[in-house]
């Protein structure tokens, strides 16, 4: 057989970039380079008129029962914490079944994924494929949040609340088994993975045990309910007994103790610290110190991401609304102002870039924008590239691969590890739920091309349904067939505790969604478990100036004047 040489640009136009090719992410300065291509050159598969995936060519006679894939995403550029590679991705029974080379093994060499008559194709040529995002800080204020999050590329959400109650406006806590049952029953209506956090503020175990058995997959300690050392100690003790995670929003006013007292109450036990910078709440001015502890899994909420010229101005009004404060009361105003510090917000940028802050989340409608978790993660990465240059791991490589792996881990695999669901979601890996998002590189992180949930397309931009083709304007993000009927419950799960499942929660509530027990959330995970984000510097905060130092180095940076992934993408 004769080989034919073609230009890289021509090859990329036909099959997408290959090993050594570089791709810019949206309009950022972040450049990725393809590390490996799983294809066999000359044997690539592609769907369409006159293309490869036809009967007797790239499509075999193998049935699905015999091993053919249900769906193949062809020639996609996978961007994940473990690598940046070009491959075909197979989906079977709603799970990722293989990453490799698709085709017809009867006539093609190197085939690891079989295409048969029962195989559908999603064209990934020239596209980027990522795992669906996981937002682990949700105030369940309104159900419309879920669609907005899904359309941004988030396929899993964890948080608390009961709807637009004042307790939910301020805290991510679902109080008590009755409210928990109603929330979990409502989850059958949504095509995403969902989990409920119960209220963790109690000084005795019984109320917390009741909530865990009632369906909580985590417990949330929030200062508005009283995050005292006694409540912290009790909550962590119960969590250890039932293998669920604890999230904490610490005591901004330092009423029941200072950050040192809270750390002492941890007793070295694993805990997920929300908005660790402090603008979202927590010991003023030095809660950020916990980001350097080995047992703390720290995350940010996105209003402070990244630090810009507008960040400080917008926060005060947000805070007054979210925490039911009155600007005419001096004490309420002082409470709000104590949380907004430009010095710690600037340091937050750098701690993310150093891998000391491990996760990104939203704090939806309660000082956070749930549709912008992914955008603001990459805006932070871009700002740090512009201000700090290449990371040491990327020096001399003419790409930003390590930085990209570090940042994508913040909203995919790391929250999945922290909350005990990384065996099911969080990355593009064989054996995991096929929760996948396809992006055009120019719109990466901003507007997805297609969102796959449990192997089924659940959302995509769609043109006029009455048009002769799918693309005429107006183009809107719309729910697809996977978001309706029993398909939405078959392709997603509810995260809960093993105790709830053992106690027959699904039967008691009459729900259709499968329950998935969180696991390995306690002593066997620590900051070292946070992939690419496990740094534990010694962090100090000057109580007078609020300056932040990590291992003695001052952490400061200028606010951004202009951001990528912003107005040019949302003009209409």
Curated annotation (Swiss-Prot):
UniProt superkingdom: Bacteria
Residue numbers binding Ni(2+) 2: 220, 249, 275
Main subcellular location of this protein, as a coarse class: cytoplasm
Pfam families named in the record: Amidohydro_1, Urease_alpha
Matching PROSITE patterns: UREASE_1, UREASE_2, UREASE_3
GO CC annotation terms, alphabetical: cytoplasm
EC numbers, comma separated: 3.5.1.5
Cofactor(s) for this UniProt protein: Ni cation
Binding site for substrate: 222
GO BP of this protein: urea catabolic process
Domain annotation Urease: ranges: 132-572
Post-translational events: Carboxylation allows a single lysine to coordinate two nickel ions.
Keywords for the protein's UniProt record, in alphabetical order: Cytoplasm, Hydrolase, Metal-binding, Nickel
Pathway of action: Nitrogen metabolism; urea degradation; CO(2) and NH(3) from urea (urease route): step 1/1
Protein name as annotated: Urease subunit alpha
SUBUNIT field: Heterotrimer of UreA (gamma), UreB (beta) and UreC (alpha) subunits. Three heterotrimers associate to form the active enzyme.
Annotated disulfide bonds: none
Family label: Belongs to the metallo-dependent hydrolases superfamily. Urease alpha subunit family.
GO MF annotations, alphabetized: nickel cation binding; urease activity
Modified residues (N6-carboxylysine): 220
Catalysed reactions, as listed in the record: urea + 2 H2O + H(+) = hydrogencarbonate + 2 NH4(+)
Enzyme class: hydrolase
Catalytic residue list: 323
